[in-house]
Amino acid sequence: MRKSMISFLEKKAKNEKITMVSAYDYHSAKILDNCDIDIILVGDSLAMTVLGMQDTLSVTMDEMLIFTKAVSRGAKKSFVLADMPFMSYQSSDRDAILNASRFIKESHANGVKVEGGIEIASKIKLISQSGIPVVAHLGLTPQAVNMLGGYRVQGKDLQSAQKIIDDAKAVQDAGACMLVVECVPVKLAQKISSILEIPTIGIGSGKYCDGQVLVYHDLLGLNKDFKAKFVKHFDKIDPQVGVEKYRDEVKSGIFPSQEHSFDYLDDELLDKLY
């Protein structure tokens, strides 16, 4: 039976961790599905990981659709989540709905992910009202890398931390059913997770999120040119074993540890957030 957003809300209520992995092809999707990974994200990170691009900004809708089709064929139980690429939803309401629907109709995804907060809340509302589950993404948002000045931890001061909290509330109110929180201080992610009713999925944001996500290639140590602080290599000899280790460590709370997280907020500053 296919996993659903309802089941992930139930996991949050029961304090059971949600597992997510970014993957881009049929065979890796089969492995993740067999390992009972909850969500397979067909991330626009494939631009760099698979296609050798410098960032995620150049990958197209057609390219994302092809890879999402492959993952959907391999995943029978896992929820397949498709990343909407840069400028596929920001430009107009019409583009947002039409492109989101293409992932469902053509690539058989189960939901879509978008980056941004208050500024795209109206797009989230339109897509979700059309019956498509929407996952939001805050903190370090790679599609806004030129605005952020690079790949840096976000929410390190009172103003930026409060902005992320306000954005999180806005996307939930707009109809987002899950939130990815990338590269924010541990205590900020914990605060967001406690405020929201929807599940949070962390990457570089500490152990208090309702789940975790890593890229398939990264957790297996397949990319020797990339090793971010928040990445842990589990097993590159046997992918199935590596994924199972990742799954078990997320569910038990072993991963992520402090060494895979960022902490810039003191308790005095945290108390000022609302």
Curated annotation (Swiss-Prot):
Residues bound to Mg(2+): D44, D83, E115
Cofactor detail note: Binds 1 Mg(2+) ion per subunit.
Pfam families: Pantoate_transf
Enzyme's top EC category: transferase
Annotated catalysed reactions: 3-methyl-2-oxobutanoate + (6R)-5,10-methylene-5,6,7,8-tetrahydrofolate + H2O = 2-dehydropantoate + (6S)-5,6,7,8-tetrahydrofolate
Record-level GO cellular component terms: cytoplasm
The keyword Metal-binding is annotated on this UniProt entry: yes
Listed EC numbers: 2.1.2.11
Pathway membership: Cofactor biosynthesis; (R)-pantothenate biosynthesis; (R)-pantoate from 3-methyl-2-oxobutanoate: step 1/2
Cell compartment(s), UniProt: Cytoplasm
Cofactor(s), by name: Mg(2+)
Protein residues bound to 3-methyl-2-oxobutanoate: D44, S45, D83, K113
Gene3D superfamilies registered for this protein in UniProt: Phosphoenolpyruvate-binding domains
InterPro entries, sorted: Pantoate_hydroxy_MeTrfase, Pyrv/PenolPyrv_kinase-like_dom, Pyrv_kinase-like_dom_sf
One GO molecular-function entry: magnesium ion binding
Alphabetically ordered keywords of this record: Cytoplasm, Magnesium, Metal-binding, Pantothenate biosynthesis, Transferase
Active site per UniProt: E182 (proton acceptor)
An annotated GO BP: pantothenate biosynthetic process
Quaternary context: Homodecamer; pentamer of dimers.
HAMAP family noted in UniProt: PanB
Record's function text: Catalyzes the reversible reaction in which hydroxymethyl group from 5,10-methylenetetrahydrofolate is transferred onto alpha-ketoisovalerate to form ketopantoate.
Family statement drawn from the similarity comment of this UniProt entry: Belongs to the PanB family.
Matching NCBIfam families: panB, PRK00311.1
Protein name: 3-methyl-2-oxobutanoate hydroxymethyltransferase
